[in-house]
């Protein structure tokens, strides 16, 4: 049984050569990505242990999530699954915005809890409605109790609200990052939009559709890596500043110098 791309798609073991070629074609993008990833993993080990305010504990978890999403995005990007990589870049950016909010914007813990309670309320109401429609006879008391609890905490005129990512990004000084690494990937990667679907259309020089395609893609890998790297460099800076990692200050400054050069090269390619 063969295990190439034509047999099992992006699970194929013949994508190693594709990955090597992509990394050779875009060395600057992957060089700084690899450097930042190693720095992030070292930071995880070097962050001092001990009690922290809840906001910092949540921010640390957010950093873990951002780094994991970054690593996952790079794995997919180098294998040519760009739409999925861009979805993970957006998720990485979302985590970075939350980290920034938790560390720099008062009231973010409460907003995060409110967002959670909105989800709990929606899920409980959905389970009640689904069971009633299906006449399952299931005990709905746990769901009804959750609804009552949330409504008691948030009266009718003050229902729990979802997090507003654009607003939080602006408050945390991450407005430009939001546009680059959250809004743009949302349009052609994170959601099944018209732009995302057009990735599977083969077009001629005039832009006319001539067939369907399903294969590794590197068409906008440069912008994908730009958005991913921008997200992580902000995350590293926040963690270094707020998590007692003074020993990384010089390394962060040097990283920013490399990023200033790499970013300009990527933006003009």
Residue ranges of each PLM-predicted region?
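A cross-kingdom marker of C-terminal helix-rich interaction/assembly modules
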Residues: 1-269
